[in-house]
Amino acid sequence: MDNKLTHFDNKGNAVMVDVSNKNETERIAIATGTVKASSETIELIKSGQIGKGDVLGVARVAGIMAMKNTSNLIPMCHPVMITGSSIDFEIDSEKNEIRITATSKVVHKTGVEMEALTGVSIAALTIYDMCKAVDKRMVIGDIHLVKKLGGKSGEFNF
């Protein structure tokens, strides 16, 4: 593992990494996270009875929009032209949780890990926002990169 932090120059100042000499390749990143909620909240989401509307539909759009705007949120993240993105949900009624999975694809000189992680994070925050009137004890967690393909560092699997 390379322990060199790439977002700092030799004086310790923050910099955006220069990717101009890197090759454009297809890159894919998959991230995941969860929202734990009460069983009542999970049932309200499943039955479409949350007052603010279609929770997962809105969270899906919010997550995709977030992926497209990641470089505006994370200072040293390069703007990339995303070629594909998706947000998927899996409701586990036994665990009272919603698992969010974000996939981001690009043909570029830099990866899309931050885009996938941002998509999961914003989708989770959107679920919280839409359900907080009925459940303030929701817990957002377990957000992490699951898989990365492409680029100089190759494949990563969690």
From Swiss-Prot:
InterPro entries: MoaC, MoaC_bact/euk, MoaC_sf, MoCo_biosynth_MoaA/MoaC, Mopterin_CF_biosynth-C_dom. One of its GO terms (biological process) is Mo-molybdopterin cofactor biosynthetic process. Keywords: Lyase, Molybdenum cofactor biosynthesis. Its EC number is 4.6.1.17. Substrate binds at residues 76-78, 114-115. It is an enzyme of class 4 (lyase). Gene3D superfamilies: Molybdopterin cofactor biosynthesis C (MoaC) domain. GO terms for molecular function: cyclic pyranopterin monophosphate synthase activity. The keyword Lyase applies. It comes from the Bacteria. The active site is at 129. The keyword Lyase applies. It catalyses: (8S)-3',8-cyclo-7,8-dihydroguanosine 5'-triphosphate = cyclic pyranopterin phosphate + diphosphate. Pathway: Cofactor biosynthesis; molybdopterin biosynthesis. HAMAP family: MoaC_B. Homohexamer; trimer of dimers. Catalyzes the conversion of (8S)-3',8-cyclo-7,8-dihydroguanosine 5'-triphosphate to cyclic pyranopterin monophosphate (cPMP). Belongs to the MoaC family. PANTHER family: CYCLIC PYRANOPTERIN MONOPHOSPHATE SYNTHASE, MOLYBDOPTERIN COFACTOR SYNTHESIS PROTEIN A. This is Cyclic pyranopterin monophosphate synthase. The gene is moaC.
